[in-house]
């Protein structure tokens, strides 16, 4: 070690080319055995150059190697469009917006009057509906629309608006907590 210091005194610049006597810093010239071990060493040091083996080509895979026919494309497009329409219909109808939280009720306008969502006379319990009741919801909506059509065709058969308002206020009062107790 002292010999190395004597050959390179402090403060003297060394040449840019490495010296032959300091071969320990030149790891590319190190004898690692066969070529496989040398490649492994270079790869582990991060200096190995990866060679393209030709095995992997982008887009060439067994699952994607077949091409779709025009009929398959049409079928897939129709399925996607039907799914899109179903989701848009459910979003725009607001059917799933009704159950936004505990005690939440959304105001709907059927005949120009503000009705509270879920004010059917047959549903007297304040319990929230379960998601399994979606079929009965659509049936009750169909019945309501049929009743509205019948009322539009026969205006003389409908109830007077005053009794209808009284029935609504009585129904709403069933859920109002009394302040006397």
Swiss-Prot record:
Keywords: Acetylation, Isopeptide bond, Phosphoprotein, Ubl conjugation. The modification N6-acetyllysine is found at residues 172, 177. Residues 1-181 are annotated as: Disordered. Disulfide bonds: none annotated. It comes from the Eukaryota. The keyword Acetylation applies. InterPro entries: SMAP, SMAP_dom. Pfam families: SMAP. Residues 106-146 have a biased composition (Acidic residues). There is a cross-link at residues 13, 62, 75 (Glycyl lysine isopeptide (Lys-Gly) (interchain with G-Cter in SUMO2)). The modification Phosphoserine is found at residues 15, 17, 63, 87, 125, 145. Residues 48-78, 147-169 have a biased composition (Basic and acidic residues). Belongs to the SMAP family. This is Small acidic protein. It comes from Mus musculus.
């Amino acid at each position: 070690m002292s010999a190395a210091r004597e050959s390179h005194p402090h403060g003297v610049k060394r040449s840019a080319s490495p010296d032959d006597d300091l071969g320990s810093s030149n790891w590319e010239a190190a004898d690692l055995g066969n070529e496989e071990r040398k490649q492994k060493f270079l790869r582990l040091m991060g200096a190995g150059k990866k060679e393209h083996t030709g095995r992997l080509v982008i887009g060439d895979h067994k699952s994607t190697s077949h091409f779709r026919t025009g009929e398959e494309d049409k079928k897939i497009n129709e399925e996607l469009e039907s799914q899109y329409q179903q989701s848009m219909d459910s979003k725009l109808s607001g059917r799933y917006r009704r159950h936004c939280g505990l005690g939440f009720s959304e105001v709907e306008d059927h005949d120009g009057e503000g009705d509270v969502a879920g004010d059917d006379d047959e549903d007297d319990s304040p319990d929230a509906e379960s998601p399994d009741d979606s079929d009965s919801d659509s049936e009750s909506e169909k019945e309501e629309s049929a009743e509205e059509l019948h009322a539009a065709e026969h205006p003389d058969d409908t109830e007077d608006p005053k009794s209808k308002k009284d029935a609504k206020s009585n129904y709403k009062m069933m859920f109002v907590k009394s302040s006397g107790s």
